[in-house]
């Protein structure tokens, strides 16, 4: 998913939760980061590189 997939979608249904799909989560995290650049990394007190490494590792050595 890319935030640029559908630039026309700016509003979300008020019943949707932040973790209901990649698009919703991506837009929410982008919003948080727009409030304070680096917010997502600061939230975890880790660099983006560390977060990315942990994310990849969560899928195992072959991305499974």
UniProtKB/Swiss-Prot annotation:
Biological processes, Gene Ontology terms: proteolysis
Annotated coiled-coil segments of the chain: none
Activity regulation behaviour: Inhibited by EDTA.
Domain of life: Eukaryota
Protein name in UniProt: Basic secretory protease
Cofactor(s) listed in the protein's UniProt record: a divalent metal cation
Role description: Metalloprotease, digests gelatin and azocasein (in vitro).
InterPro entries for the chain: Uncharacterised_BSP
Post-translational modification: Glycosylated.
Keyword list, A-Z: Glycoprotein, Hydrolase, Metal-binding, Metalloprotease, Protease
GO molecular function: metal ion binding; metallopeptidase activity
Enzyme class, broadest EC rank: hydrolase
Organism: Boswellia serrata (Indian frankincense)
The keyword Metal-binding appears for this protein: yes
Enzyme Commission code: 3.4.24.-
